[in-house]
């Protein structure tokens, strides 16, 4: 057997820093531990976040708009901190050791959160049937724990999906096909954890207590850590390629230094290493593209370039691959930006959907009440249904028409999800119109809950789940696949920032809408008593923004050109 058949060709190594053996490492034998880790970690995250808006209202005595904004601000931070973890992973530690470091911050935050909800003196006091009146210290401890978790997840989230994809050699056609399937099952694992969180854990929080409700997710996070480390001997590790930000700035500086230099018509004259390997550790060479030609100046050799002992000064002369890294990041940005509005729609599940459900009849039978936050289980059920259906049925069917091995291109897949999200917001808006009509007809303005079943919310949750399978999984695969090899954690983090900015956009929209609609003594669209508001207008506003966003996405996606990599990594 030839050496190339024994070892991977993508530059990966095993835990002992030896070339990765195909038979002993990677593939599904490694991914089972990664999927187990992700399932338990997401159970912990959603077990804490799904019902957070109700904790803020009932235990920290916050109003609807304040609680919703605090949830979206925290959730947004959870998707901004991955930029920190991604930079550390790509530049210094690699994905494995970054995850291994940040899990301890995560567990510490979860532990403190549990203590803040269960230990006398730390948990909110002065409680009556509906709410508590915490002091400033108790509130501070809670938010410190919450943002420790945000930092911990920031080191894990951008790395774990890319780390799983690293277990498949892109230079092996069989493994390359399996990698595409991995992203579907990765998202499936996320939603298995989310399903347990939305049912069992929310019920515990609402019926047993918040101490147990946060304690169980903490135990789940400890189990996630065990899953991760148990698989260490099977993992393939990509070596860090040095600071990606440094390489980006080197191209920019070199290009501006040669601002008056003309780029040759023959692009083969641009500087590139002579052998098959890229000069960037852990990265394959990238084929030159004709877009963003200004940056090609950084790869034009001139007499002013200083070369010592065969080494090029990278602040004066950059390889074509290094230039194409920057181009790849820039061309990803328009696609990235269109994900922000979708994330805003998605964030409504943990805020406005829950608040809407709080006003409806939550009885399931005579003696059981389902917490409004538990309705998100139908989003999860939708994801768990559509993920294998997409992987096993839709892709093979689509291949017959598109002749694409993936069924749809990644951009087509994401676009389908954007369309579905528009209908999700329209559905939520129509339900709110019907609910408000019931309130008006029965003069139920001051009733805490009206006689209208919460299960009328199911369609909007199912549509959000369907949209996730197309857009979020498409984003995971797209940003990994189109990222330069040595910037994959960074690009995965970049895709996650759409969720952060989507949450922040939701906060801004709620704040602006309330400021405008509360004028002249009116209660506004989203008052504490939703029976006197117009939440339907807010949902229709999001539907309109989503439609406009989709039109922009169509224009961008038609002009996008997929990257091409050649050679092998060293």
From Swiss-Prot:
Modified residues (Phosphothreonine): 98
Keyword Disulfide bond: no
Pfam families hit by this protein: PTR2
Protein source organism: Arabidopsis thaliana
Deleted gene: phenotype: Reduced growth and lower N content when cultivated on dipeptides. No effect on germination.
Parts of the chain that traverse the membrane: 99-119, 140-160, 182-202, 210-230, 329-349, 377-397, 414-434, 454-474, 494-514, 537-557
Annotated membrane topology: Multi-pass membrane protein
Tissue: Expressed in cotyledons, hypocotyls, leaves, roots, flowers, pistils and vascular tissue of sepals, anthers, carpels and funiculi. Not detected in seeds.
Keyword Transferase among record annotations: no
Record-linked InterPro entries: MFS_trans_sf (IPR036259), POT_fam (IPR000109), PTR2_symporter_CS (IPR018456)
Function: Peptide transporter. Mediates the transport of di- and tripeptides. High affinity transporter with low selectivity. No transport of amino acids.
Entry keyword set: Cell membrane, Membrane, Peptide transport, Phosphoprotein, Protein transport, Transmembrane, Transmembrane helix, Transport
GO molecular function per UniProt: dipeptide transmembrane transporter activity; tripeptide transmembrane transporter activity
Identification of the protein by name: Protein NRT1/ PTR FAMILY 8.1
Subcellular location: Cell membrane
């Amino acid at each position: 057997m030839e050496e190339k058949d024994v070892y991977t060709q993508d530059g990966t190594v095993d835990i002992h820093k030896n070339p990765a053996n195909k038979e002993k490492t990677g593939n599904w034998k490694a991914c089972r531990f990664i999927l187990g880790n992700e399932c338990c970690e997401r159970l912990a995250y959603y077990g804490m976040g799904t019902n957070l808006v109700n904790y803020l209202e009932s235990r920290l005595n916050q109003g609807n708009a304040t609680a919703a904004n605090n949830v979206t601000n925290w959730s947004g931070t959870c998707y901004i901190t991955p930029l920190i973890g991604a930079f550390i992973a790509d530049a210094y530690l690699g994905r494995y050791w970054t995850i291994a470091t940040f899990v301890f911050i995560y567990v510490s935050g979860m532990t403190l959160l549990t203590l803040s909800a269960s230990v006398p003196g730390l948990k909110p006091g002065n409680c009556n049937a509906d709410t508590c009146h915490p002091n400033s210290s108790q509130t501070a401890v809670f938010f410190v724990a919450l943002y420790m978790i945000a930092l911990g997840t920031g080191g894990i989230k951008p790395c774990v999906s890319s780390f799983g994809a690293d277990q498949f050699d892109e230079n092996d056609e069989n493994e390359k096909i399996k990698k595409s399937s991995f992203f579907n099952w990765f998202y499936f694992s996320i939603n298995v954890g989310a399903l347990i969180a939305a049912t069992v854990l929310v019920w515990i929080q609402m019926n047993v207590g918040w101490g147990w409700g946060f304690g169980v997710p903490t135990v789940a996070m400890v189990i996630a850590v065990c899953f991760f480390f148990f698989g260490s001997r099977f993992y393939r590790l990509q070596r860090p390629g040095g600071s990606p930000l440094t390489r980006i700035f080197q191209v920019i500086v070199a290009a501006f230094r040669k601002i008056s230099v003309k780029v040759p018509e023959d692009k083969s004259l641009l500087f590139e290493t002579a052998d098959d390997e890229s000069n960037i550790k852990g990265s394959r060479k990238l084929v030159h593209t004709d877009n963003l030609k200004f940056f090609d100046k950084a790869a034009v050799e001139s007499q002013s370039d200083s070369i010592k002992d065969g080494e090029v000064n990278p602040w004066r002369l950059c390889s074509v691959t290094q230039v194409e890294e920057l181009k790849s990041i820039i061309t990803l940005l328009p696609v990235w930006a269109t994900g922000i509005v979708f994330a805003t729609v998605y964030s409504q599940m943990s805020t406005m959907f829950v608040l809407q459900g709080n006003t409806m009849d939550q009885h399931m039978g005579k003696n059981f009440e389902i917490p409004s936050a538990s309705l998100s289980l139908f989003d999860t059920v939708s994801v768990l249904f559509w993920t294998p259906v997409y992987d096993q049925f839709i892709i093979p069917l689509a291949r017959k028409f598109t002749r694409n091995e993936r069924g749809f291109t990644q951009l087509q897949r994401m676009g389908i999800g954007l369309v579905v999200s528009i209908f999700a917001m329209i559905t939520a808006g129509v339900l709110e119109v019907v609910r408000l009509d019931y309130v008006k007809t029965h003069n139920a303005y001051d009733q805490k809950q009206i006689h209208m079943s919460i299960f009328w919310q199911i369609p909007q949750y199912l549509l959000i789940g369907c949209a996730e399978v197309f857009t979020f999984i498409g984003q995971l695969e797209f940003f990994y696949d189109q990222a330069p090899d040595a910037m994959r954690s960074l690009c995965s983090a970049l895709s996650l920032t759409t969720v952060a900015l989507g949450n922040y956009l939701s906060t801004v929209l709620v704040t602006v809408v309330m400021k405008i609609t509360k004028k002249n003594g009116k209660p506004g669209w989203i008052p504490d008593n939703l029976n006197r508001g117009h939440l339907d207008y807010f949902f229709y506003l999001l539907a309109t923004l989503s439609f406009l966003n989709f039109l922009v996405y169509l224009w961008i996606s038609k002009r996008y050109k997929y990257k091409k990599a050649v050679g092998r990594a060293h």
